[in-house]
């Protein structure tokens, strides 16, 4: 007897692990679906059901044995479920057609049997969004001292010793605002005006016929929105976990039926830290996005039905074919020709020794030159082997967490691309200047964009023949600029690149350094030839500008004079945290414990304090013990490499005294 079918047209907006039914060997996923009809505004709910094999049942971890923590709960179960999810053909079809509207083919019981893409339908489908802001106080029970773990991070130790309190929740929807605080008295909570949590989330029950019986599945539903934005700090402060735990209890604890599972993995569970978002593969069964809310249209934005990337850090997925699948790596055979091109480490940092003079760690070009900067990572992502790798996965991460076969593929394509561009530049009479991981710099004779245009077209053809699509323009994979002087250096322990712009017409051919006349920090005078106080937003940018100035100055120019020009800028920005943040590679000394466990988030940036480098976040007030002297000494060191001069001990003493005086100035509140 034929089973009657139903259909629904629209967009899949999420697939969630609902439950496992051991007695009938069934796993159930919840499918959130948005109908094409804009008048049908609420999320619809359907289900994908699969039968578990004996082997899958034997491998299934017991969730009862998992003890929830601030950072994770039932991680092994999430890893087990992910392997099954990636094998289910209905879910695989939904993932492959995620950018398109689809038609779901279902049984009467809302069980999805097939997913049919509709490529010719492009109806705009705006998504309703809500915003959840979670704050909490994180306190250490024991002060943490000593060196960080082998990973260079402190968050694991902090989470073991900390307490989460004073949780504040604010959830803003189109229908109003829900808010609560963990330390509020019950009377205050009742009297507070605004939405109740039951106005935001409700519980729906679906009776699903499965394996000859009817299962009552409980599902969370948000009538007012499709997507929930959450503030960035919720990734590490523990408040979101507590909110969703309480919400799960509120919705399902007194209802008959099977609720969705409650499991999660937050960045704090990753020993070395991660750039990937938290994973909540089951409850709250709604698309989660982190950061400042923006409007979303399902028909026009790139959409992932689930983002389990954080699991690739853990055994069971790390460096396995499952990790490759999660990343979107498409394995293809690599030709024998590519193997012959494997010469460069991936990625590599190097300076053309033929451009170096006194040291093989620094090259200075003191003649007008065109400079072409090629974004190798962007170009590699146009290659057929790597084009399907998720945009949220950097190639550095791919090299670290993927299979040896995937890593080998990246290395071969990296070498193939480098060989292509370097061979082309040599054949055209150009010189490569430096390679810094995923960026290549080379010098060209063209000084104007019009002169470079024919060369670009020829390079584009060469890349295309090698399997790479060079776009240029606003795509960011290639940038042309023209300079009077250039510097490339690794002498400070990290790569520095600076170039002074060429003079423009009417300037008599003199260099045109990037500086303007501007007011002082109090607005009551002028500092002639001082850098624009609004011109840079980070200390590293000011460092580059100091080098540019040094390249343009006579050899006998005082180093202190060059630094003095940026002191007004430093004073203006002295209490601005984001200005002083730098990578750990630019720091000196052993990192010290941060005040909060946000070093679980990558990439990590640091403030150099008098105790040592400290991982820090731009949104927090500057530490009181910033080591401004370190930043001034690094600026001096950068300038000195451009114009080395002989100085007597008296000059050295004068420089020390002046740097200390500027340090006292910057330390003023």
Swiss-Prot record:
Subcellular location: Host nucleus
Domain of life where this protein originates: Viruses
Spans annotated as Disordered: 502-526
Chief location category: host cell
Cellular component annotations (GO), alphabetically ordered: host cell nucleus
Signal peptide extent: none
Spans traversing the lipid bilayer: none
Annotated family: Belongs to the herpesviridae HEPA family.
Subunit structure, as described in the record: Associates with the primase and the helicase to form the helicase-primase complex. Interacts with the origin-binding protein. Interacts with the polymerase catalytic subunit.
Function noted in UniProt: Component of the helicase/primase complex. Unwinds the DNA at the replication forks and generates single-stranded DNA for both leading and lagging strand synthesis. The primase synthesizes short RNA primers on the lagging strand that the polymerase presumably elongates using dNTPs. The primase-associated factor has no known catalytic activity in the complex and may serve to facilitate the formation of the replisome by directly interacting with the origin-binding protein and the polymerase.
Protein name as annotated: DNA helicase/primase complex-associated protein
Organism of this sequence: Human herpesvirus 8 type P (isolate GK18) (HHV-8)
